[in-house]
Amino acid sequence: MSFLLNHYKIFFSSSLNHFLAIFILSIYPLFFFMGTGVLNTCIVLLDLIFIIDIINKKKFSFLKNYTFYSLSLFWLILLTNLLFSIDQLNSLGRTLGFIRFIFFVMLLIYYFNLENQKYQKIILSSWLTIFIIVSLDLIYEILTGQNILGYKSYMPGRLAGFFHDELIIGHFYYAFVLIILVYLLKIFSNLKTHLIKKNFY
């Protein structure tokens, strides 16, 4: 308990930019249930906070790494392919919009590594909590035919969960399941190490 409290003390004593970024990132999975428009707005807002942060702190060197260069190269390839697209106008928005994901990946790396990765623990703990609640809700839906809010899938055999009339719960799992599994493995590994040290040292 004291371990988590220390992390949250750092969170609440951080700068406004950090506070907003970590708070939005912590509840990021919830935006999946609010629709694509809200989710994309969230990403753009986080991108702006991140850009302001690195400008204020003059941390431009952070962008000088393999990940940023690789994503930027991929974006340039998309722009080049746009020249040969049959429907250039329709493809233009998606291609230009890809830049928000480049900055989103970079801001995840940036904030995950601040404060000796303490922000990372806050964010991933929140994601894990949300993921568990969503999973328990799906189990409840399997057993009762509706989720805890009373939502029912219009298609028998398909689960809706908190998405109500949109059968896209699989997209949510694809986005978070690997991250959650890696985080759980890290938790169990740290717990195992702690128990070994406690018993033998």
Model-derived segments and their meaning:
Residues 15, 67, 147, 154-157:
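Sparse, context-dependent recognition of short Cys/His-centered cofactor- or disulfide-binding micro-motifs
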Residues 73-75, 101-106, 129-133:
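Small-residue-rich segments of transmembrane alpha-helices in multi-pass membrane proteins
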Residues 28, 79, 121-154, 161-201:
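Alpha-helical transmembrane segments of multi-pass inner-membrane proteins
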Residues 39-50, 93-107, 141, 148, ...:
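Hydrophobic core segments of transmembrane alpha-helices in multi-pass, intramembrane catalytic enzymes
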Residues 90-97, 154-160:
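Non-cytosolic membrane-interface motifs at loop->transmembrane helix junctions
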Residues 1-90, 110, 114, 118-121, ...:
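Transmembrane signal-anchor hairpin modules in multi-pass inner-membrane enzymes, especially those
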